[in-house]
Amino acid sequence: MSNPVAEHYGQPNLLERIDSAFASLGKDSAHLTTDDLAPVDQFHTGGMEATAEMARLGEISRDENVLDVGGGIGGPARQLSSQFGCHVTVLDLTEEFVRVGAALTPRVGLKDRVSFQQGDALRLPFPDASFDVTWTQHSTMNIPDKPLLYRELHRVTKPGGRMILHEIMAGPLQPIHFPVPWAIRG
């Protein structure tokens, strides 16, 4: 990996550590719910409540195609699909997150509604007008070229579609110094 964001977030053996944590709680990690996973996959400000509120305000509905850019291991994507019946594609720069998200999703019965793809938000690997909704939660802060990011999000959003963003927007215009509060290694 040569990208500092991918290097920071790409921790090895993440799935094994998640499985071990569930085993220590006496929980079968092969059969989970989105609520079970929330402590490990909803690490953005506001957690599941913020995701639900964003979805309500954004009027997410059944059978829409949603692109979750920087969606990590897929917590919000699984929640959206579970609660609203939409299909969600998670795009993340970090290969380990994509691998773990793809492994966890069948465990909550959503493998046909949530998919994962490794890729760069500044070069979205999708045709124009592919998604009803483009969605981000605390991922744009990791992307310095905001104008290009927003052009790419707009490009893949269908005419009349929605861009739904939950981001921290204010602060000094300096490079990000890891770890940011929601990405502390534990």
Each model region followed by its residue ranges:
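Short, glycine-/aromatic-enriched active-site segment of Class I SAM-dependent methyltransferases
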Residues: 168-186
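A short glycine-rich, Lys/Arg-flanked "PGG" loop and its adjoining helix->strand segment in the class I
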Residues: 147-162
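N-terminal auxiliary segments of SAM/dcSAM-dependent transferases
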Residues: 1-24
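Class I SAM-dependent methyltransferase Rossmann-like catalytic core
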Residues: 35-45
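A short acidic, Gly/Pro-enriched loop at the edge of an enzyme's catalytic core
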Residues: 122-133
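Conserved alpha-helix/loop element of class I SAM-dependent methyltransferases that forms part
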Residues: 27-30, 44-62
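A short SAM/SAH-binding and catalytic strip from SAM-dependent methyltransferases
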Residues: 132-145
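Class I SAM-dependent methyltransferase SAM/SAH-binding core
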Residues: 65-123
